[in-house]
Amino acid sequence: MKALDKQNVAQALSVVPGVVLQKSGSRNEEQVKVRGFDSRQVPVYFDGVPIYVPYDGNLDLARILTNNLGAVEVSKGYSSLLQGPNQMGGAINITTQKPTKPLEANLGYRQGWSRSRDNAYDMHASFAASSDLGYLQVSGSQLKQDFLGLPHGVNNDIAGKHGKMINSSADDKRGIVKLGFTPRENDEYTLTYIKQDGEKDNPPYSGNSGQKSRYWQWPEYDKESFYYQGTTQLNERFTLKSRLYRDTFENTLMMYNSLADLKNKKGSYSHYSDYSDGAGLQLAADVRENDLLSFAVNWKDDVHREKGAPHAAYDRYEDRTWSLASEYQWAAADNVDVVAGISYDWRDSVEAKKHENDGSITHYDDNNQSAFNWQVMGKYHFANEDTLALSYYDRTRFPTLKERYTTSKPAYNQIAIVNPQLKPERARGGRFNLEWCLHARLGI
């Protein structure tokens, strides 16, 4: 990511084969599609912890900076069901760095210019220390943009003046604290805290389609995550992995639908206050010399709260999701590996409450859904580092809270119908994958 100068996760993912960057105009979001599957169908994980937004499954990946990250991985065909539910189209996993030396430190700063003016800067710093008993890593980063530059010759009230695009600022800050304890060679226990504070504006459309320009701002796009992860080798055959987490999301939107509204700060208001609690256990057993049998149980509670005025009461929606999964990795021959996985997922509606304009409260009926998933992959290893893999999957994802409960009026005067009993979406597909190394630094 650093070598390619990718400043956020969306940009980093855009260079992965089969991944397409998708920019949203109305919400000024950067998301990706993985072989045609969108963010609702491809969950995003941070060190294996799901961080996608509970309400609609979306997440603005441009808000996640790449400084001090270890890697960003995309699972397209075969995606381990041990991670949890809703992996219909695969999964994206972002991993944080771990120190590799007794003492490490890093400091960086970059300045950006547009139209002969400084318009942005990027800075980051990190410190880490490690020993045989564990490690500590602290890092922080900020990417701030005051404005986007306008082309020469563009100077009007809608787009902006003096080379500055109106309503185009952004400010993203992130801090990470990671504490690890390694009492034995194969045991590791980590506590991680991540705080992300984001602000962004959405520049107006200034084309000729007749579309009305609007000036939306997000003074708050904040995520906070705290999680524990443990790996314990119980004996020579069994290994237990454990996970416990809380992830929160605070999102405030100010909707100014004209330049006059923007100047007078007169517009509509929307606020989300969401959180997710979850836990997981994974037990792995060495069945034969090179075979591995794993079992996993995952639990996740998603709570979405929203209101349309600063002093209004919250609408509240809560789902509880469970997943039981198993996976077997079989070394069929010296150069042939086979891996297969199954899972059974179920989701229960705990609460769905909406405050109506007339002061009444609507309580939607409880609802629940379940789904079975399975997949298999075979991989052949050639004499060199080339591999040939063939996989087939049958996976699902549960409808989001937005898909089941939204009553917002869509465009073109359509009517939204509440559908709490909406069933899981399912995808079946196969993948043929050849990794062919043409040269030490070149492959297909």
Annotated model-derived regions:
Residues 100-116, 122-219:
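Periplasmic-side early beta-strands and strand-to-turn transitions of outer-membrane beta-barrels
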Residues 103, 133-136, 185-189, 236-240, ...:
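Repeated loop/turn-to-beta-strand initiation elements of outer-membrane beta-barrel proteins
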Residues 199, 250, 303, 346-358, ...:
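Surface-exposed extracellular loop regions of Gram-negative outer-membrane beta-barrel proteins
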Residues 10-49, 70:
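Extracytoplasmic beta-strand/coil segments of soluble accessory domains associated
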Residues 21, 49-77:
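Short acidic/polar hinge/loop motifs at secondary-structure boundaries
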Residues 109-113, 131-133, 142-146, 195-199, ...:
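Transmembrane beta-strands of outer-membrane beta-barrel pores
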Residues 13, 71-74, 92-94:
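Non-catalytic regulatory/gating segments with a bias toward low-complexity or hydrophobic composition
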